[in-house]
Amino acid sequence: KEMQNRITADIAAFRLPRYAQIPEVGLYLEQVVRYINARLAPLGEPELTGSMVSNYVKQKLVPAPQKKLYTAEHLARLLFIAVVKPVVPLEGLRLMFSIQEECYPLQTAYDYFCDEFENMLGAAFGVAPAVEGLGETESDAKDLLRSTISATVNKVCLDRYLEEYRKRREQAETIVGKEISLL
């Protein structure tokens, strides 16, 4: 129960920054990496690295920075990539961005992603009941995004529980080891 409470507290406090909250001033690569990793730390997923960001630029998933500076557009795309990359391959991300560009402005799509991700994450961890019908329209693009978020949330759930069990086992082994050394 203690493990569940610790995870639930992390998830209850988790919020993705909305587009209007993302820094508008340009950030350098290392600042971008720190900003994104700080926001996503409660999810327990692998951290974003500078070389990963450079690769996403090279793969044209993220526009090239202007004078080595990354803007809110870059950060929104990188936050999305960092959250869903454990379940969506690069080619899938490319297709999703293409669909998004055809259907919704980045700010609208990103904010909807944040709302839906937090909604499903909270429901999966029992923090809050799922809110049905977020957003004003139904579309294939939103269905695709919801499926992506659902898969991502399930992976986050699994990873967090496995990590907590791993920590618990290590602690138990440490205690047993100390007891044996006392004999």
Per-segment meaning from a language model:
Residues 1-101:
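Basic helix-turn-helix/winged-helix DNA-binding cores
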